[in-house]
Structures are given as structure tokens and as C-alpha cells.
């Protein structure tokens, strides 16, 4: 975790009295911290997803899987709803309490959130082949890197686009809830296609917004917490874009 202490000199958030060079160095350290935390979250998610998949399934040959007792508990029992919904409660709590919690509490909450997402996303390993998951991941990573770079470097304000994309997220949620009852393949395809576009736009907007959050004269501790919150936003953009790409392009295992 020592990698995240590179804010120490110069300290970002020390106010506007610093030179332009110090501001640039502090901003760079702040953004590196954001991406480091995001990478940590993705690593935790991947490890937990793989561990849950390994413990929850057994290979019975010809690419077919059978569920273990643990697999039945997390994939085919009411417990799965707790696994799906608990990250939502945690992310709301983290966002609401960010200003008052300590850096260590914020960090631990983010790691716990990433672990819960990994447990939930392990179901994707049951449904889709490893090769198609890998392709979707690298496609999402390439798109994310390009869009985040654009959001960081562009001089154009993306706030209007961001507001529009947030309305799109609400639409995706409503459509997703509706499709839980309709089970429409066509509607699911449309939802996934729109999700790629929406979270691509949010990646650029969130990056610009996170960059702008830096210039606030905040304390050293608050800048650390802002970097964790920024990492959470970009983490969610990436995870949602990855899942949408996987649903569009993924190859399912033999049933």
C-alpha cells in the first residue's frame, strides 16, 4: 500500500499558492493514485471471482460444469440476491460517508466493495468461456485507456455529455428491471449496446471530473479519500463496460 503514499512530496491539495510545476506534479501524483486504486480494485475483483468460480464448480468434461455445494449457495440460492445487492448498499454508504471517514476506512470499504463485485461477477465465469472473457476484458481495457486519456487531456467541457449519460444510466436500470420479467434477447442486446456507449462516455467525463476535483485546496487526507472515490467511479465505468462488451460478444459454455 506504500505506493499510494507518493502524494507526500509535493502534497496535492495544499492550495493555490504553489507554483505551476508543483501543481502539475501534485496532479500527476493524484491521478496516478486514482489509477493505482482502480487497478487494485480490479485485481481484487479478478482474484475473488476466480476463487469463487474454482470453489463453486467442478469440470465434468466436454466443457461442462457442475455446481458444488458452495456453488449452489452463491449461484442458485436466495443468498445470490444478497451477493448482488450488498455492493450497492456499500457504494452508497461509501459515497455518503466519504467526508467523515478515515483514509484507511475508505480504502478498506473500497476493497470490500471490489471483493463483493468479484463474488457476484464469478457467475460470468460459469456462463462464458475463458477465451471470450479475455477478449472482452482486453477490448474494454483498450477502450477505457483511450477514453480516459481523452477525458484527461481535452480542453472541452464534458459536463453536458456527462449529465446526458447519467440519464442514460437511469434508462438502463429501468430497462434492465423490465427485462427481468420479459426475458427478451433483443432487449438485452439493445441494453448491452447502449451500455457500451453510455459507460464509454462516462469514462471520459468521470476522468475530467476527477481531474478537476484536485484543484480544491484540500488537506492531504482529503486528497487521498478523493483519489479512492475517483477510483471507485472509474472502476464502475470499466466493470460495466466490460460486462456489456462480454454480453455482446461472449461465447457461452456448453450447457
Identify the residue ranges that each predicted region occupies.
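A hydrophobic alpha-helical transmembrane-helix feature that marks the membrane cores
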Residues: 1-255
Amino acid at each position: 500500500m506504500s505506493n499510494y503514499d507518493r502524494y507526500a512530496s509535493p502534497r496535492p491539495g495544499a492550495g493555490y499558492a504553489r507554483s505551476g510545476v508543483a501543481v502539475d506534479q501534485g496532479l500527476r501524483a493524484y491521478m496516478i493514485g486514482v489509477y493505482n486504486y482502480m487497478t487494485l480494485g480490479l485485481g481484487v475483483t479478478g482474484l475473488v471471482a476466480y476463487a469463487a468460480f474454482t470453489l463453486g464448480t467442478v469440470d465434468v468434461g466436454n466443457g461442462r460444469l457442475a455446481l458444488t455445494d458452495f456453488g449452489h449457495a452463491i449461484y442458485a440460492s436466495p443468498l445470490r440476491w444478497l451477493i448482488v445487492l450488498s455492493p450497492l448498499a456499500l457504494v452508497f454508504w461509501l459515497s455518503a460517508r466519504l467526508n467523515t471517514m478515515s483514509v484507511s476506512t475508505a480504502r478498506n470499504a473500497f476493497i470490500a466493495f471490489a471483493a463483493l463485485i468479484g463474488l457476484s461477477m464469478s457467475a460470468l465465469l460459469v456462463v462464458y468461456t475463458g477465451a471470450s472473457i479475455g477478449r472482452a476484458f482486453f477490448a474494454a481495457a483498450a477502450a477505457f485507456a483511450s477514453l480516459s486519456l481523452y477525458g484527461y487531456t481535452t480542453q472541452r467541457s464534458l459536463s453536458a455529455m456527462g449529465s446526458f449519460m447519467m440519464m442514460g444510466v437511469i434508462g438502463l436500470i429501468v430497462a434492465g428491471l423490465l427485462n427481468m420479467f420479459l426475458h427478451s434477447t433483443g432487449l438485452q442486446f439493445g441494453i448491452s449496446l447502449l451500455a457500451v456507449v453510455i459507460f464509454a462516455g462516462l469514462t471520459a467525463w468521470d476522468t475530467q471530473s476527477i481531474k478537476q476535483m484536485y484543484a480544491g485546496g484540500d488537506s492531504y487526507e482529503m486528497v487521498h479519500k478523493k483519489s479512492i472515490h475517483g477510483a471507485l467511479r472509474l472502476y464502475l465505468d470499466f466493470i460495466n463496460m466490460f460486462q456489456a462488451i462480454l454480453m455482446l460478444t461472449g461465447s457461452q459454455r456448453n450447457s
